[in-house]
């Protein structure tokens, strides 16, 4: 089936938009794993709860941007509490214990959201409703704006890690936790802050993407599987690799949907995952070991 250039360009934009949101989610998960060696199965539920905080804040204030900030702050604090009460006592033990703990947290949060908000999906209205014409097809401005916002948040994270004092502490903790603590860096609070930052990024992703898909108690499950695929393909703990993998996989799915249904196009990401595990288990976008 022939595909017009206009449709190809639209799918390219769709892939980039989805890829940037996925990169934002994956960045938080990668940050947590790269520094703490914790596989957080509850990460998708932080996205879901962030979206619900956005729904409530938007209903109270009418401001989408206030809802975005409130979701990030509330879930950052909530993530820190979850870490301190559930994960911190398990650090240093068998990694399976933290996996089971985060999986349990995920189930609890899903069922809490179902009990509190019900099974009916909620809606967050787009702050921008305009469209522009690309060739003869209309494309929403909001999709481009959320891609730009996601890129700005990821860029801010990179600058924070590169130049901020707390970011330097985080990088020092990643390289040698014992030496960092010996130099006076408060490693336990650095780890708490890292988990809070990762949770906030998931919450921001939930609010940004909610106008496109709606908000329900199971939305985190849909995201966490794809996020783990991105993290593995990009290289476990590799922030830049996760961003590249998110855009790469989203573009592949977008292009595949030109010929097959979107439900079938999802298979592409699993094919990439299997090929990565078979031929380059360190990740497609991970630096080649010297």
Residues of each region from the PLM?
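Membrane-interfacial amphipathic/re-entrant helices at transmembrane-helix boundaries
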Residues: 1-24, 53, 61-67, 93-98, ...
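Transmembrane alpha-helical segments of polytopic membrane transport and secretion proteins
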Residues: 1-7, 82, 87-91, 281-290
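Transmembrane helix-bundle core of multi-pass membrane transporters
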Residues: 89-163, 190-193, 255, 260-263, ...
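Transmembrane alpha-helical segments in multi-pass inner-membrane proteins
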Residues: 22, 26, 62-73, 192-202, ...
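Cytosolic-side transmembrane-helix boundaries in multi-pass membrane proteins
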Residues: 7, 25, 116, 175-182, ...
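Alpha-helical transmembrane segments within multi-pass membrane transporters and channels
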Residues: 62-105, 112, 244-249, 280-281
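Helix-loop-helix "hairpin" substructures at the membrane interface of multi-pass membrane proteins
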Residues: 18-19, 24, 138-216, 239-244
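Membrane-embedded helix boundary and interhelical linker motif in transport proteins
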Residues: 13, 35-81, 85, 259
């Amino acid at each position: 089936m022939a595909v017009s250039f206009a449709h190809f360009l639209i799918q390219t934009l769709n892939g980039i938009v989805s890829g940037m949101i996925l990169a934002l989610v994956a960045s938080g998960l990668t940050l947590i794993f790269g520094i703490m060696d914790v596989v957080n199965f509850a990460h998708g539920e932080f996205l879901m709860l962030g979206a619900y905080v956005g729904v409530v804040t938007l209903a109270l204030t009418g401001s989408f941007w206030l809802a975005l900030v409130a979701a990030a702050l509330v879930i950052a604090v909530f993530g820190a509490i979850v870490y301190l009460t559930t994960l911190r006592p398990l650090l240093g033990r068998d990694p399976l214990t933290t996996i089971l703990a985060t999986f349990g947290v995920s189930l609890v949060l899903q069922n809490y959201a179902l009990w509190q908000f019900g099974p009916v999906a909620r809606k967050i209205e787009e702050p921008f409703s305009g469209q522009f014409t690309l060739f003869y097809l209309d494309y929403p401005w909001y999709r481009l704006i959320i891609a730009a916002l996601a890129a700005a948040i990821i860029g801010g994270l990179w600058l924070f890690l590169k130049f901020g004092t707390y970011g330097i502490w985080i990088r020092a903790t990643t390289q040698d936790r014992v030496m960092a603590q010996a130099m006076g860096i408060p490693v336990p609070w650095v780890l708490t802050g890292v988990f809070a930052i990762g949770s906030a990024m998931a919450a921001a992703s939930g609010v940004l993407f909610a106008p496109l898909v709606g908000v329900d108690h199971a939305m985190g499950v849909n995201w966490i599987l794809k996020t783990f695929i991105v993290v593995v393909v990009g290289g476990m703990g590799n922030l830049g690799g996760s961003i590249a993998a998110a855009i790469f996989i989203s573009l592949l799915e977008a292009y595949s949907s030109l010929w097959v249904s979107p439900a079938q196009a999802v298979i592409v990401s699993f094919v990439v995952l299997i090929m990565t595990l078979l031929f380059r288990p360190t990740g497609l976008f991970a630096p080649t070991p010297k």
